[in-house]
Amino acid sequence: MQKKIYIKTFGCQMNEYDSDKMADVLNASDGLIKTDKAEDADVILLNTCSVREKAQEKVFSDLGRLRELKLLKPDLMIGVGGCVASQEGDAIIKRAPYVDLVFGPQTLHRLPEMLKQRRSTGRSQVDISFPEIEKFDHMPPAKVEGATAFVSIMEGCSKYCSYCVVPYTRGEEVSRRFDDVLTEVAGLEAQGVKEITLLGQNVNAYRGEMADGEIADFALLIEYIAEMEGIERIRYVTSHPKEFTQRLIDTYAKVPKLVDHLYLPAQHGSDRILAAMKRGYTSLEYKSILRRLRAVRPNISISSDFIVGFPGETDEDFEAMMKLIDDIGYDNSFSFIFSPRPGTPAANLADDTPHEVKLKRLQRLQAVIDQNTRRYSDEMVGSVQRILVEGPSKKDADELQGRTENNRVVNFSAGPNAAHLIGQMVNVNITQSHAYTLRGEIVVKQ
């Protein structure tokens, strides 16, 4: 019987990409196939996130449940990867001695050897080193199902924002070679992928070495990918305002395949708090980027991250953040109460704001963003949107589902025998808007 692997992914799209690579590596080396049921698996991997404390504690909660499964299946291999693994290392084994593997984001390509060592020695294996970009040299060619795919173009972050653990868990910024990225995208194009999302903690800091030794920036990478005929849409996450160059803005004017949606985390709107966060820009500089971008893409949708209750945040600071939100008119946003992460400078800052105050601020911020989201969705009713059909609707198998350029899910009926439309671009007339989705009808060519 073919052995199976179950992977649970926490956190960001980088982790989703890494989880796919874990499955690819272990399929190529050991023939493991993916399963959606942990109880059916021979290997279980938790790909973790340490950005917020809640996500970290979920991991140890899951490990507690897996302990019971291991008692029933002694040969079961349990591994912890990702940023919690990188941060905690051997401490995971001490807290949960039944864990067999602990590996960081940069060492997932070593999983086959780690499994082999665990089985031969009987000892838990830990490898949380930072061998720069080595892991991409050991990956089998990407295999995908569907019309969309992620491609990691760089690893790590060198910004060292005062609240963030990423530089400590994923290392400094290292870019993949230019031709390696293009080769991966071309391979995905050959499999029918129409939409590529370029991934990195700070994608617009990309500096990839070309075959002639020259260095390509992020804008050039986008331009080359856009030349691939089969790729119809290009997205990217996450970008940093400090690295958002005029060249990248000019690329929006030149490359129609670059979607009308930008995720550009502001984190706050108070210059005093932005300085304490070590973000490297002011609210005015942030707004200047979007003003120049909207000059070439007037209809671009903007989303962001916001941290509420950063240590020392006053009512005045919070109002500055609300003003930024009002000035920009965000389409949507991820927002959270500040979560101090061990080892970061912000974890040592005095914080005397009551939790109840932070919670009220968060609720107010989210209410405004939700109102914006609903307003933008309502304004789309009656328009015809170009949709990339991703598959059957999750709520009605007789309908299809796809996304607009501004990343809204659209459910629509396309009549009988419409499965051939999956993976295609179609025009859909938007007829209804809901909180987070749209409904529509396919536009039939006359």
Swiss-Prot record:
Any one GO MF term held by the record is: N6-isopentenyladenosine methylthiotransferase activity
Chief localization: cytoplasm
Q: Which residues form a coiled coil?
A: none
Instruction: Enumerate the UniProt keywords alphabetically.
Output: 4Fe-4S, Cytoplasm, Iron, Iron-sulfur, Metal-binding, S-adenosyl-L-methionine, Transferase, tRNA processing
Q: Which reaction does it catalyse?
A: N(6)-dimethylallyladenosine(37) in tRNA + (sulfur carrier)-SH + AH2 + 2 S-adenosyl-L-methionine = 2-methylsulfanyl-N(6)-dimethylallyladenosine(37) in tRNA + (sulfur carrier)-H + 5'-deoxyadenosine + L-methionine + A + S-adenosyl-L-homocysteine + 2 H(+)
Q: What class of enzyme is it?
A: transferase
Q: How is the cofactor bound?
A: Binds 2 [4Fe-4S] clusters. One cluster is coordinated with 3 cysteines and an exchangeable S-adenosyl-L-methionine.
Q: Which InterPro entries match?
A: Elp3/MiaA/NifB-like_rSAM, Methylthiotransferase, Methylthiotransferase_CS, Methylthiotransferase_N, Methylthiotransferase_N_sf, MiaB_methiolase, rSAM, rSAM_horseshoe
Q: Where is the TRAM domain?
A: 378-444
Using the record's annotation, list all stretches that form the Radical SAM core domain.
143-375
Q: Which cofactor does it need?
A: [4Fe-4S] cluster
Question: Quick one: which residues bind [4Fe-4S] cluster 1?
Answer: C12, C49, C83
MTTase N-terminal domain: residues covered: 3-120
Q: How does it assemble?
A: Monomer.
Question: According to its UniProt entry, what is the function of this protein?
Answer: Catalyzes the methylthiolation of N6-(dimethylallyl)adenosine (i(6)A), leading to the formation of 2-methylthio-N6-(dimethylallyl)adenosine (ms(2)i(6)A) at position 37 in tRNAs that read codons beginning with uridine.
UniProt family annotation: Belongs to the methylthiotransferase family. MiaB subfamily.
- Name it: tRNA-2-methylthio-N(6)-dimethylallyladenosine synthase
